[in-house]
Amino acid sequence: MTVLRHAVVGLAFAAGVMGSAPAHADSEFPFGLEMTLEVRPQPGSKRIPRLEIGDNGEAQLDLWCKAGKGQFSVANNTVIFVPGAMQDSGCTPERAQADDALVNALVEAATWTRQGDFVSFVGATTLRFRVNTN
């Protein structure tokens, strides 16, 4: 009877610990998620850069004006981003320059961190994205 009681208490404790785990761990890279850059829209636009990372690291970028694809490779907190071809949809020089700077910052990022719904790519410039939860 004592063994049975200990087993029930142990199972109840394990269920409580497992039940309190978050839906995503802070240490998980955001594969399969869409994120939005934490910035204000540029003057005259409502568009904010968005990044969607597939389950295998393939990425779709929708920036201030340009759109394109890329590939993320991740090992622990190290990240490598390789951009693909970008499509220019009649960008103003200012928006094209902002898009190029954003892609370059992703390329230069060496590490990444995640705190809740925020993912940061850290290099010479830190880019902070919010995971879209809706």
What function would you assign to each model-found segment?
Residues T2-L11, G16-N134:
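Lipid interaction determinants
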